[in-house]
Amino acid sequence: RVFHLFDYPPLNTGDLQLKAKIKPFIFTSNNSFLSYNDVTVKHNDVPAGDPFKASAVIKDTNPNPYIAAGVTAILNDVLGRFAVPLMNDLKTGKTDGWDLMMKYDKHSTRSYMALAYTPSDHLNLPKKPLPTDVINWLETFDK
C-alpha cells in the first residue's frame, strides 16, 4: 500500500512531484565491480574457474564440485523446483506448485538448502543437502 503513494495525485502536484523523485535500483550492471576475498573484477570480465577463491571459504566439504556447478546453476535448481510449478499454477488454475511449497513451509530458504534440498543430477553434486559453507558462499553471490 505504501508504494501507491507514489501514484497518489495530491503528492504529485506543484513542487512536490513525489513520483519524479524515484530513482531506479539496478542490481547488476556490466560496468560494476564484483569484490570478494580481496579480489576485484569487472562484472562483465569475470575469469573462469575460482577467481574469488571460494575454495578458501568452503571448508566444511570438498569445494570443487560446488564451484564447478556455480552459484547460478545451484540457486536455479534450489528455487526452480518451486518457481516452475508455481508459474504452472498461474497458467492452469491448479495448486500443485502451491501444495509443494506448503510442504516445505516450515523452512526458510536457508534451512531448506541445509536440511531438505537434494541437488538435481545434472549438477554433479553430492546427493545430500548443502553444507553450511556452501550456503554462505551462495548467499554472498546471490544478486
Swiss-Prot record:
Its EC number is 1.4.3.2. Keywords: FAD, Flavoprotein, Oxidoreductase, Toxin. It comes from the Eukaryota. It catalyses: an L-alpha-amino acid + O2 + H2O = a 2-oxocarboxylate + H2O2 + NH4(+). The keyword Magnesium does not apply. Its cofactor is FAD. GO terms for molecular function: L-amino-acid oxidase activity; toxin activity. Belongs to the flavin monoamine oxidase family. Ascorbic acid inhibits the cytotoxic effect caused by toxophallin. The mechanisms of such inhibition could be based on inactivating the H(2)O(2) that appears as a result of the amine oxidase reaction and is toxic for cells. Cytotoxic L-amino acid oxidase with high oxidase activity towards DL-methionine and L-methionine, L-phenylalanine, DL-norleucine, L-isoleucine, L-arginine, L-tyrosine, and DL-leucine. Shows relatively low activity towards DL-lysine and L-lysine, DL-asparagine, DL-valine, L-histidine, DL-threonine, DL-tryptophan, and L-glutamic acid; and no activity towards L-cysteine, L-glycine, L-proline, L-oxyproline, DL-serine, and DL-aspartic acid. Does not use benzylamine, ethanolamine, diethylamine, meta- and para-phenylendiamine, ortho-, meta- and para-aminophenols, or putrescin as a substrate. This is Cytotoxic L-amino-acid oxidase. The lineage of its organism: Eukaryota, Fungi, Dikarya, Basidiomycota, Agaricomycotina.
